[in-house]
Amino acid sequence: MKNLFITTLFLLCFSPLHAQDPIPSCPLISKATANCDTLRSYSLRTDTVAVPQIAFPSGFQQLGENELTDSLGILNPFWEKLRLLHAGFSTDTIRIVHIGDSHIRGRILPRTTGTLLTETFGAISYTDMGINGAFCTTFTRPDRISDIAALHPDLVILSFGTNESHNRRYNTLLHYRQMDELVRMLRDSLPNVPLLMTTPPGSYDSFRKSRRRTYSINPRTAVAVETMRRFADDNGLAVWDMYEAVGGRQRACLNWQEAKLMRP
């Protein structure tokens, strides 16, 4: 179930997914044995949701691990709510709020994700709150925190980092403090709601050379991603590292661009 959520949540990353941490244990509803001609018999819970085996575009190279990291198990209550909803033991609407920058503001990703989650699990409310050019500090305003809290989310997803890393004077300490301010404000208003952080997809830098505008891969994205992962580890957030999954420092931007999914 965790794998399906990651797959539908991030349609831009079309690789088979696996989770770094175990799905939380819960009472078995029942078991069914599935046989396969080429694989040994294995046991499946009857509430298991199949994950479609979707591949990246053929041009994508040097892909990293596509996994969701949750070493503290903060998402366990969320997975359990999804399980109960899918099994028909709950009719409560599960509410997800996704805040971030332009790739959330574009709405295609979150709205498609919300539709697929609803088709699979039932009563899912998926609200996107993206702002073009947003930094994480864009949301460190009492009114925006109140707007998020008023939706009574079961999960909040944070997708920032692109605009922070575009600053040529990018400072890791400042970025860390800004994330800390946002997370502290969210936790003050939503103390029992898990937070999932995603890293940026990669970006290009622009500069002038011989009176012509030239583009190159932004080298600060990798530094920002490292800062975000360190912050999440230090502060108990779950992380999905999209940047690493699509190729990281060496291939992320090139993979997107060659597949005509990104341009400088």
Stretches found by the model and what they are:
Residues 70-84, 137-150, 177-185, 222-226, ...:
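Alpha-helical scaffolding within the catalytic cores
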Residues 193-196, 238:
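Proline-centered loop/turn at the N-terminus of a beta-strand
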